[in-house]
């Protein structure tokens, strides 16, 4: 008997977007000679992707599409610099909406680390957080953790 990597012999290998549950639409573009393409971020992993759309009726910028969907072609990754101008303008609002839609997952980042050095290091990974701010965040967090972004903002003085 040969060892396996957790997949049956006749199972297809898992794709990079198989665990994604939603797409949040950043932009809709017309494609030549026909059809449309949407640029999106995936949820929960926040990949930037694009997909051909069979029917743009009901597809709106900023709204989420549940996956899997028969109306979409395959997903392919897009670099941030390759997004259309309108999609780049929409990305901050879409990321905020995705975070708000799954608060527990994202607040968990602040509460995940157990010992002091891991908490300190995790906070230092955030953009704009230096040593003194990371120490302040660790002390403000305490053992109980936070339950909302408002608590984090208030305790740590983050804008």
Predicted regions and their residues:
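Accessory alpha-helical DNA-binding modules that contact the DNA backbone or grooves
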Residues: 106-120, 132-159
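Conserved interaction-surface patches within small, structured recognition/assembly domains
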Residues: 122-124
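Structure-specific DNA junction-binding interface
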Residues: 1-103
């Amino acid at each position: 008997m040969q060892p396996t990597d957790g997949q049956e012999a006749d199972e297809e290998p898992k794709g990079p977007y198989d665990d994604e549950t939603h797409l949040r639409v950043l932009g809709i573009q017309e494609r030549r000679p026909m059809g449309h393409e949407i640029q999106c971020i995936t949820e929960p992993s926040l990949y930037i992707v694009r997909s051909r759309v069979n029917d743009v009726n009901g597809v709106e910028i900023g709204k989420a599409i549940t996956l899997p969907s028969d109306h979409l072609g395959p997903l392919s990754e897009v670099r941030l610099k390759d997004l259309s101008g309108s999609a780049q303008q929409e990305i901050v609002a879409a990321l905020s909406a995705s975070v708000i839609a799954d608060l527990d997952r994202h607040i968990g980042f602040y509460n995940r680390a157990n010992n002091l050095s891991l908490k300190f290091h995790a906070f230092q990974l955030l953009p704009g957080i230096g040593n003194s701010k990371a120490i302040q965040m660790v002390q403000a967090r305490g053992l109980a953790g936070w339950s909302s972004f408002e608590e984090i903002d208030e305790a740590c003085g983050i804008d």
